[in-house]
């Protein structure tokens, strides 16, 4: 089944991409959740027009993404979390908590969906966190999870 993605789907593509997926995945998940629309010739033409406008906008956004990357690279982010014996957290650190900690540390407002975590953060310590700011720009910073 051919579909056109309307949102970024991990492992599949970016908005505007035309991809081939299995019928069940498209019909039962992507289409009802609003992640994609069914492919037609008219929809494909519309997507090419939108992509052209988006590419012009991305050139401008690339400069902003590099600026945000510069802010994040030198940032020290500390997140206070409750922990038990041995430094094991009660629960785990979420992307939303990391975004709030970056904002509290004086960093820019980030989109939690673009964070790339090294796995589930369930203990105290220092963790590398990456964020995809732009298709061509990825920033990295260290997150310190401390007893709070």
From Swiss-Prot:
Q: Which Gene3D superfamilies match?
A: Ribosomal protein L9, C-terminal domain, Ribosomal protein L9, N-terminal domain
Q: Which Pfam families match?
A: Ribosomal_L9_C, Ribosomal_L9_N
Q: Which PROSITE patterns match?
A: RIBOSOMAL_L9
Gene Ontology MF term list:
rRNA binding; structural constituent of ribosome
GO terms (BP aspect) = translation
Annotated keywords: Ribonucleoprotein, Ribosomal protein, RNA-binding, rRNA-binding
Gene Ontology CC entries for this record: ribonucleoprotein complex; ribosome
Recorded hits in InterPro entries, A to Z, give: Ribosomal_bL9, Ribosomal_bL9/RNase_H1_N, Ribosomal_bL9_bac/chp, Ribosomal_bL9_C, Ribosomal_bL9_C_sf, Ribosomal_bL9_N, Ribosomal_bL9_N_sf
Q: Which HAMAP family does the record cross-reference, listed alphabetically?
A: Ribosomal_bL9
Q: What does this protein do?
A: Binds to the 23S rRNA.
The family annotation for this protein states: Belongs to the bacterial ribosomal protein bL9 family.
- What's this protein's name? Large ribosomal subunit protein bL9
Q: Which gene encodes it?
A: rplI
């Amino acid at each position: 089944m051919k579909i056109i993605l309307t949102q970024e789907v991990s492992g599949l593509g970016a908005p505007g991409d035309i991809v081939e997926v299995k019928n069940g995945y498209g019909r039962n998940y992507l289409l009802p959740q609003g992640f994609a629309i069914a492919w037609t010739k008219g929809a494909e033409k519309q997507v090419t027009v939108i992509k052209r406008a988006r590419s012009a906008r991305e050139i401008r956004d690339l400069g902003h993404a590099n600026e945000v990357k510069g802010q994040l690279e030198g940032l020290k982010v500390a997140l206070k979390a409750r922990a038990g014996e041995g430094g094991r957290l009660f629960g785990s650190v979420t992307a939303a908590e990391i975004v709030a900690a970056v904002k509290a540390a004086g960093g820019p407002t980030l989109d939690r969906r673009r964070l790339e975590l090294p796995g589930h953060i369930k203990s105290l310590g220092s963790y590398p966190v990456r964020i995809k700011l732009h298709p061509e720009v990825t920033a990295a910073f260290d997150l310190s999870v401390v007893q709070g």
